[in-house]
Amino acid sequence: MKGTPQYHFIGIGGIGMSALAHILLDRGYEVSGSDLYESYTIESLKAKGARCFSGHDSSHVPHDAVVVYSSSIAPDNVEYLTAIQRSSRLLHRAELLSQLMEGYESILVSGSHGKTGTSSLIRAIFQEAQKDPSYAIGGLAANCLNGYSGSSKIFVAEADESDGSLKHYTPRAVVITNIDNEHLNNYAGNLDNLVQVIQDFSRKVTDLNKVFYNGDCPILKGNVQGISYGYSPECQLHIVSYNQKAWQSHFSFTFLGQEYQDIELNLPGQHNAANAAAACGVALTFGIDINIIRKALKKFSGVHRRLERKNISESFLFLEDYAHHPVEVAHTLRSVRDAVGLRRVIAIFQPHRFSRLEECLQTFPKAFQEADEVILTDVYSAGESPRESIILSDLAEQIRKSSYVHCCYVPHGDIVDYLRNYIRIHDVCVSLGAGNIYTIGEALKDFNPKKLSIGLVCGGKSCEHDISLLSAQHVSKYISPEFYDVSYFIINRQGLWRTGKDFPHLIEETQGDSPLSSEIASALAKVDCLFPVLHGPFGEDGTIQGFFEILGKPYAGPSLSLAATAMDKLLTKRIASAVGVPVVPYQPLNLCFWKRNPELCIQNLIETFSFPMIVKTAHLGSSIGIFLVRDKEELQEKISEAFLYDTDVFVEESRLGSREIEVSCIGHSSSWYCMAGPNERCGASGFIDYQEKYGFDGIDCAKISFDLQLSQESLDCVRELAERVYRAMQGKGSARIDFFLDEEGNYWLSEVNPIPGMTAASPFLQAFVHAGWTQEQIVDHFIIDALHKFDKQQTIEQAFTKEQDLVKR
């Protein structure tokens, strides 16, 4: 190479070609090249002194240059033909990379998926260790280029398996991320041929301790010798735990008899954690300290076009990702879902090449299961001719059925306008593809969706009317005016509604209209999402939720079924008992039997329980219709009074002296949910009535504590019991789950509150604040959850309607 005056790249803007051009420029060589399009990569090469031409022409090729081409360059390319006619020296990209690595300790990463991520992580670790490696990587990092010639003898590079060029390399260490049924057209359509090439490649490494392969990949397992890494217990580098917190991953692994705990990676997704584990193994093998590795992974800045944020607005999120194979798409969407919870995920997918789409036509439909909406657009052909077997509208229908999502086809030229009308507050859009789909994110960089119209509903007919107003007043402070326009709907004690924008003025009014009146109905119709902050009957028991479902409106808080079930304390006890959660022993009573046999009821209770006992109504709030009784006369009196409020009553064994422990929940028990707390509610005398709970009639409010002074085992126990109850009740929306903790350390379920108090003094919101949330984030989540519940139901209803239409035809 020393005597070569110049290198000319056909397609110099390509991510792989530009990396090698950068290395040559760093080493002092003269570089020129041509490409069809201007790009950031070309600008960065020009800044280093490269001469770059737009388009391909024979005049661009210097007479004395080595001409570099890649497998994507067509045989009839004018510059390629010119080089042949002139008998210029021609080098395939892989041959040049091999020459550039001569004399270096090369660490090569190959495999169907994850090459760029893994090689970028290895590069970042060696840079953090001050090793100054050379590298040629198929992606741009936020803080460095894709190619660089360093001062050390370490060289990190991707080794592309797609075109059979692995034969050119003699690596010192390798990572093989996985093998898939991809690019088999270069292997006579035979997977065995690809496996053989991978085997030959790995065998070039003389030290098997420097051959790392994915032990979770069934094709690699048994076909490669070296160090297996992955989640399977038999892997030599075993990832023993993984969890994702927002956009970061945390994992622990064992390797060579050592355990490395809680590695923090600034990337989401199990697949990225596996890539990072492989990078850790390589770095440890090369003698890099684990603390340096930790630091590098924690601050890793990611790779261009790998879940790269494209927009500015905080009201929604637009991400761009290079994923274009079904495995990559599924992994990417899974990591996004785990990061954003119940926010609506809109996947915008541009298939890459007709040949790849045809090969993967059976697997693509199931790749979008973690999305909520899929927009399918035109195939990026990369010069290929269309295939008759591919009909995008049919593929959209297959995606809908196989991924259980709404899917539609939108022409590429119409997508930006479509999204401007479709994106709403809190949406997460992910463009997927290796073609020119990146232009969509660029076009929406400064876009802001319109505000959501929120209807805050409060008051109500129950005796907890005043608490509802206090809760709504507190919640309204944290409804962001940047995201939402708020209207208030106040229900008076007679069930009449009034609406407006001025909450204090509405509270002072006393009149109202039927919810079916033209004024109220019109106001409800304009609302995007309803937010009920109602307590007790006609608001917390499924009644108002059913009304909202009839209106066809999203609503925050508990679903109809959770609200109705939780407000039936007897049904709640039966459900909890069925899943092994201890409940306070009780005896149910109904009004009909009580009226005919009160003496028998009293006798049964006295024989079952000892005094004091607790009398409770079955369908009222958590502190209404609840009485502590200490003798037979008081028992009869309070049962009679309780039946004035409810047709179902029960008597519980007293838990006086026990501690009242509460766990707060929001989200969907079947997918994403969060549990906060526990907290303790402490009364002055042990029994907390309605007045003490809220501080009425001059009584001091019951104290709320988050410092429970309990063992970790006890805290884990109550959270597990609360989780069991929430799942058994198919929790959707919100709930506070209350327990008694007796002197022996046993927990007993007391009740479940579907819309807990949300006043400034209430523990429900405080619990999430203690967990690190802001009040605004809690309110946002209520609205996100409401939209999620509604969207899922709409998708099901649309599918049902579609199937009905097909049957009719």
UniProtKB/Swiss-Prot annotation:
Pfam families: Dala_Dala_lig_C, Dala_Dala_lig_N, Mur_ligase, Mur_ligase_C, Mur_ligase_M. It is an enzyme of class 6 (ligase). Pathway: Cell wall biogenesis; peptidoglycan biosynthesis. ATP binds at residues 111-117, 606-661. Keywords: ATP-binding, Cell cycle, Cell division, Cell shape, Cell wall biogenesis/degradation, Cytoplasm, Ligase, Magnesium, Manganese, Metal-binding, Multifunctional enzyme, Nucleotide-binding, Peptidoglycan synthesis. It comes from Chlamydia pneumoniae. Its cofactor is Mg(2+); Mn(2+). Residues 1-450 are annotated as: UDP-N-acetylmuramate--alanine ligase. It catalyses: UDP-N-acetyl-alpha-D-muramate + L-alanine + ATP = UDP-N-acetyl-alpha-D-muramoyl-L-alanine + ADP + phosphate + H(+); 2 D-alanine + ATP = D-alanyl-D-alanine + ADP + phosphate + H(+). Residues 451-809 are annotated as: D-alanine--D-alanine ligase. It is found in: Cytoplasm. GO terms for molecular function: ATP binding; D-alanine-D-alanine ligase activity; metal ion binding; UDP-N-acetylmuramate-L-alanine ligase activity. Cell wall formation. Residues 573-784 form the ATP-grasp domain. This is Bifunctional enzyme MurC/Ddl. HAMAP family: Dala_Dala_lig, MurC. GO terms for cellular component: cytoplasm. Mg(2+) 1 binds at D738, E751. In the N-terminal section; belongs to the MurCDEF family. Mg(2+) 2 binds at E751, N753. Binds 2 magnesium or manganese ions per subunit. Its EC number is 6.3.2.8, 6.3.2.4.
